[in-house]
Amino acid sequence: MAETRVRKNESIDAALRRFKRSLSKEGTLAEVRKRKHFEKPSVKRKKKSEAARKRKF
């Protein structure tokens, strides 16, 4: 779990940017989006094979 403490004399915007950066590094937001709706195993396999095909070319 990402945790960001606001430093002394740091603006909220800067702290929020640091927090969002840490979330993206961990992959938390991507994981939440992926788990938001159920995905059938056949669809997962299809996406996985398409991603492999894209990497190949």
Curated annotation (Swiss-Prot):
Q: Where is the composition biased (Basic residues)?
A: 33-57
| A GO term for molecular function | structural constituent of ribosome
A Pfam family matched in the record: Ribosomal_S21
Give the GO biological process terms. Answer: translation
- The annotated region (Disordered) lies at 32-57
Q: What UniProt keywords apply to this chain's record, in alphabetical order? A: Ribonucleoprotein, Ribosomal protein
Q: What is one cellular component GO term in this UniProt entry?
A: ribosome
Q: Which HAMAP family match?
A: Ribosomal_bS21
Q: Which PANTHER family match?
A: MITOCHONDRIAL 28S RIBOSOMAL PROTEIN S21 (PTHR21109), SMALL RIBOSOMAL SUBUNIT PROTEIN BS21 (PTHR21109:SF22)
Family named by the database record: Belongs to the bacterial ribosomal protein bS21 family.
Fetch the NCBIfam families from UniProt.
S21p (TIGR00030)
The identity of this protein, by name, is Small ribosomal subunit protein bS21
Species of the source: Shouchella clausii (strain KSM-K16)
Gene it is expressed from: rpsU
